[in-house]
């Protein structure tokens, strides 16, 4: 997030000082994409770039209007949320038109809505945040001079929370790191909980195939949780076979026993 980016910038300055000769550029992948698009517009573009829509209400209205047009019904907030989630998933997973019908959004006409949504954005010269990454990736793939420029600009790349990174984000990172191979990714597929938002932990599992010279280092010491918590967590996560085998070891002394609490609804959780 932008807030996390600013916090990391502040931490770097606190550690190394404002006068450090080489202050790293700390950005979200959307921030990097924006920089790529701006550079393309200045050096190759024949007109102004599309505008990123920051007002979520504008995008929600487009989805709502299209839903009403296609179904003849008014969309509830939950319907709009699911449809927008589906749109973002398609773009982040780089799905093709042939895959749209397989996506479970609860709306049979989602493929047509998706096409019309993107058409509506282009007609307004708008792009959403996911388009920003699509355009950046397309630019890097089709303009070798721009790709070389940003590969030279980012000779060393560090990616945090890599398990939450989407497929298209990994593709952009791979393009930028291709020249030097100086890529350091920090992530844990066991902690990937944003699959519904198109997080792509498979990229971590395929890391050595994507980057043949890579080394994978496991950090198995846990400084946060007690042995009781880690015992349960290790036993639970081993049931997932699509992961790197690892056992997290505690550094803290024993704590209280772990209790399983059942709550019938959200209100019942408040007591805990």
Locations of the language-model features?
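ATP-hydrolysis module of ASCE/P-loop NTPase motor domains
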Residues: 20-24, 42-130, 216-218, 222
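Phosphate/oxyanion-binding loops and surfaces in catalytic or ligand/nucleic-acid-binding neighborhoods
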Residues: 15, 39, 43, 69-70, ...
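Conserved helicase NTPase motor core
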Residues: 25, 54-59, 104-206, 218-225
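Proline-centered turn/helix-capping motifs that create local helix->coil transitions or kinks
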Residues: 75, 95, 180-181, 236-246
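Conserved nucleotide-binding/hydrolysis micro-motifs of P-loop NTPases
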Residues: 2-5, 30-33, 189-193, 198-202, ...
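Residue-level signature of catalytic and energy-coupling elements of molecular machines
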Residues: 1, 28, 63, 87, ...
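P-loop NTPase Walker
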Residues: 1-46, 148, 202, 231-234
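Helicase P-loop NTPase motor core
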Residues: 212-215, 220-272
């Amino acid at each position: 997030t932008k807030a996390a980016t600013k916090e990391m910038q502040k931490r770097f300055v606190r550690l190394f000082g404002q006068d450090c000769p080489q202050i790293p550029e700390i950005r979200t992948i959307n921030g990097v994409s924006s920089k790529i698009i701006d550079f393309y517009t200045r050096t190759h573009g024949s007109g102004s770039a599309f505008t990123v829509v920051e007002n979520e209400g504008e995008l929600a209205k487009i989805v709502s209007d299209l839903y009403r047009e296609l179904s003849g019904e008014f969309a509830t907030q939950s319907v709009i949320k699911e449809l927008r989630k589906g749109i973002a998933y398609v773009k982040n997973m780089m799905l093709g038109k042939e895959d749209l019908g397989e996506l479970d959004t609860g709306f049979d006409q989602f493929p047509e809505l998706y096409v019309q949504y993107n058409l509506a954005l282009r007609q307004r010269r708008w792009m959403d945040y996911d388009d920003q990454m699509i355009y950046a990736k397309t630019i890097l793939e089709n303009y070798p001079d721009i790709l070389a420029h940003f590969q030279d600009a980012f000779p060393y790349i560090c990616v945090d929370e890599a398990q939450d990174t989407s497929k298209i984000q990994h593709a952009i990172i791979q393009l930028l790191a291709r020249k030097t191979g100086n890529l350091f990714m920090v992530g844990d597929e066991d902690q990937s909980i944003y699959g519904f938002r198109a997080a792509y932990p498979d990229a971590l599992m395929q890391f050595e195939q994507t980057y043949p010279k890579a080394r994978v280092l496991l950090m198995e010491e846990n400084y946060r949780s007690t042995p009781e918590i880690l015992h349960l967590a290790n036993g639970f996560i081993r049931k997932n076979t699509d992961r790197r085998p690892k056992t997290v070891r505690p550094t803290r002394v024993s704590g209280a026993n772990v209790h399983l609490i059942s709550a019938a609804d959200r209100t019942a959780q408040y007591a805990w």
